[in-house]
Amino acid sequence: MYEYLDRRYALALYEVAEENNKVDEYLRDLKEVVNIIKNSEDICKILKHPEINTSRKKEIFTELFKDKVDDKILSFLLVLIEKDRILYLEEKLKEMEKIYLEKNNMISANVKTVIPLLKEEREELIEKLGNKYNKKIILEEEIDKSIIGGVYVRVGDDVLDGTLSTRLKDIKKMMLKRE
């Protein structure tokens, strides 16, 4: 249920951003606000504190962000405080990023390897994924020593798992079944 709400909030803000030709600015500002909330224990305590009323929380946010973000973003943040959804701002940001990718015929691909991909490997992977999904690929690379070797790719709900750790687990399962 909340994913649906996150999507609705994100879509509403995206439409406002699009009308004002400020999609990139809004995404950047929201990322900054999310980072500030995540990295500030004081702000988290204020937002979670049951004895600090909604009006005071809104005043604090207005003081913090009035000259740092667009007025429409500030209004959005205040609505989230009013609806007690501000602690879920990151989910709304992620939904807004998804909407941005969808509207621009792009898709995000998360790639895990033990060592960084070479330039040629990265380009080939982007090309193959682009052909498969018929979209521009935004590659997010991650180094993960636990996969031992190979490559793990997640695009949306699709997973391509060519990791050594998964192969070893599969072999172990096969051997245990035989016993």
UniProtKB/Swiss-Prot annotation:
Bilayer-crossing regions: none
Leader peptide range in chain numbering: none
PROSITE patterns documented for this protein: ATPASE_DELTA
A Pfam family matched in the record: OSCP
Main location: membrane
Topology in membrane: Peripheral membrane protein
Keywords carried by this UniProt record: ATP synthesis, Cell membrane, CF(1), Hydrogen ion transport, Ion transport, Membrane, Transport
InterPro entries according to UniProt: ATP_synth_OSCP/delta_N_sf (IPR026015), ATPase_OSCP/d_CS (IPR020781), ATPase_OSCP/dsu (IPR000711)
Subunit structure, as described in the record: F-type ATPases have 2 components, F(1) - the catalytic core - and F(0) - the membrane proton channel. F(1) has five subunits: alpha(3), beta(3), gamma(1), delta(1), epsilon(1). F(0) has three main subunits: a(1), b(2) and c(10-14). The alpha and beta chains form an alternating ring which encloses part of the gamma chain. F(1) is attached to F(0) by a central stalk formed by the gamma and epsilon chains, while a peripheral stalk is formed by the delta and b chains.
Family (UniProt): Belongs to the ATPase delta chain family.
Protein name: ATP synthase subunit delta
UniProt source species: Clostridium botulinum (strain Langeland / NCTC 10281 / Type F)
Originating gene: atpH
